[in-house]
Amino acid sequence: MARFFPLTLTILLFFIQRIDFCHTLVPANETFKFVNEGELGQYISEYFGDYRPLDPFTSPFQLCFYNQTPTAFTLALRMGLRRTESLMRWVWEANRGNPVDENATLTFGPDGNLVLARSNGQVAWQTSTANKGVVGLKILPNGNMVLYDSKGKFLWQSFDTPTDTLLVGQSLKMGAVTKLVSRASPGENVNGPYSLVMEPKGLHLYYKPTTSPKPIRYYSFSLFTKLNKNESLQNVTFEFENENDQGFAFLLSLKYGTSNSLGGASILNRIKYNTTLSFLRLEIDGNVKIYTYNDKVDYGAWEVTYTLFLKAPPPLFQVSLAATESESSECQLPKKCGNFGLCEESQCVGCPTSSGPVLAWSKTCEPPKLSSCGPKDFHYNKLGGWITT
């Protein structure tokens, strides 16, 4: 009988733990049920959407319902304060592409599950944390919304489910979420064609054309291409840190860990003020930018502190000597020049016509449609009006 004792004890401890979880309830004063109804917010928000603020708030972050159309609301975290009179930006979304309607509900019940449901009761999104020991919900100062147990352990966190944005301290991780996906357009909150993907051997940007089942890689972050043959990426985290003890400068970087080393960091920019309230975003057009919020000012609190693809190279005196990931030309953006696609020095090349003249570029520029690939379908156009010297 002695040999069965460890197994019996293990089973007994398991059931005791399960019983403990079943009796752990969220205190009544911590539960809530919000209905998506009533007045809309008065201040300007990103994508010019309407919004309704909810009670969960930790400066400068607040949980909200927001929309661009009256019947399609997204549950999201907003970053920004009213007193700065600056644009409020959306840094996390629960239900992108699966909106809820007026009178939808957000419920945090005694069982510890956070549930977003439409007005007819249909569940649109949830944390799936029912009866797992959750005792509370809070938004941390870094913008991470968490559900935690009686010991303070996070049983669910918004940092584990990024959409197109990484806040400071947020990561892409192998075995979890490994990519950011762009938004389709300012007025359409569904997944767009661009993605920032962490793969075993690098961090890459991809574009998914509507005409192809396979995404096209259009950029690779340089430092991550130097991994040894026998190591692979495990995580990439957006971070800030003091450059020195005096706190005169702050570094924004992408830190990474690998399978057999501590990893390293790709420094993106060096800023002269505290950049804790920053986020990295994959933009609608496929660019990558960092936005930094200065909560110490009353106006113009937002600043773009990094742009991967620039219209023109920055002046030499503005180039950060600390940066290891330099900016590139906008010509690398897949749809910079529409379907015609010819770009030089961040400028779209004019459109040649069958009659000869080259017209100024416009969004309607596109290559001619060929009926076949036969030699008869190819010819040169004579360009008149040129003077040779």
Curated annotation (Swiss-Prot):
It is found in: Secreted. Glycans are attached at residues 29, 103, 230, 235, 274. One of its GO terms (cellular component) is plant-type cell wall. Residues 88-193 form the Bulb-type lectin domain. Keywords: Glycoprotein, Lectin, Secreted, Signal. GO terms for molecular function: carbohydrate binding. Residues 1-24 form the signal peptide. InterPro entries: Bulb-type_lectin_dom, Bulb-type_lectin_dom_sf, SLSG/EP1. In 14-day old seedlings, expressed in the epidermis and apical dome of the shoot and in the hypocotyl, cotyledon and epidermis of the root. In developing seeds, expressed in both the inner and outer epidermis of the integument. The keyword Lipid metabolism does not apply. Its main location: secreted. GO terms for biological process: water transport. It comes from the Eukaryota. May be involved in the limitation of water flow through the outer epidermal cell wall, either by direct modification of wall structure or as a signal instructing the protoplast to restrict water transport across the cell wall. This is Epidermis-specific secreted glycoprotein EP1. The gene is EP1.
